Amino acid sequence: TAVGDGATAFQDFRKLLDCKDVQAVIVATPDHWHALMGMMACAAGKDVYVEKPLTLFVGEGEWLQKIADRTKRVVQVGTQQRSGLHYQKARELIRSGHLGTISSVRMDAIRNVSPGFGNPADGEPPVGMDYDSWLGPAPLRKYNPNRGLYHFRWFWDYSGGQMTNLGAHHLDIVDWYLGLDQLRSVTSIGGRFALRDNGETPDTQDVIFDCGKFTVAFVMREAARGEPSGFGLRFHGTKGTLAIDRRGFKVWADP
């Protein structure tokens, strides 16, 4: 749906893709639609800017890449932190060796949303909502308010929880700064332990990425009282540590 003076609104995105004067599209839908809409846009001759996460599962990424290559379309993922000047400056410091050898990275996503998002009953979708279109490629389920915006992120049918919500941004920065091409293994443990709602994805999760020459730890808490989230990322090196989030960055160096 488009908004703004003079903009044309579409109930069916396929009609938008039929417009010959549209050169590019932005896909900012629930996650389970990202890859399919991106592929359809490429097939229609449009360049694509798609919100993260790019896909819901790995195979979708491979399909989208093949179609983008075949149609020679530009596809960019919305990991907008790369546009931040302080993220660019921090990258220069790390890649210049200012921190020495990086041996580990910690990614934090800590907040407290206890007791959760409630347990609303299944019911009828709101008037004006095309629920079949909203589901799209997802499994058929009865409508539930928590499966709509914004909380669809806590259901496996549509998303991957905070790992693919906030974790996607953090991992992109790690990849940009250090590279993840030597990734050997990923180990994850957690569950929905604390929140009393109908969500499915973990509210507590610890993930370790073995990247060959360094490790990355993702620490996610949705029900942690008293511990501030602080900086989203910490890069630990032999000469110092750099902590960074969207507000700025700070470096601690040995004397």
For the regions a language model picked out, list residue spans one by one.
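Short strand-turn motif at the edge of the Rossmann-like AdoMet-binding core
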Residues: K52-L54, G78-Q81, A109
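Non-transmembrane alpha-helical segments in soluble domains
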Residues: R14-L17, I26, M39-C42, Q65, ...
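Contiguous beta-strand/loop segments that form the cofactor/metal-binding neighborhood of enzyme cores
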Residues: Q88-K89, T101, R106-G161, N165-P255
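N-terminal Rossmann-like dinucleotide-binding module
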Residues: T1-G4, H32, Q81-G84, I94, ...
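Rossmann-fold dehydrogenase core element
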Residues: W63-Q81, A90, H98-V105
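N-terminal glycine-/serine-/threonine-rich beta1-alpha1-beta2 phosphate-ribose binding loop
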Residues: T1-V50, L56-V74
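Short loop/turn motifs at secondary-structure junctions
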Residues: D5, D21, H98-T101, Q182
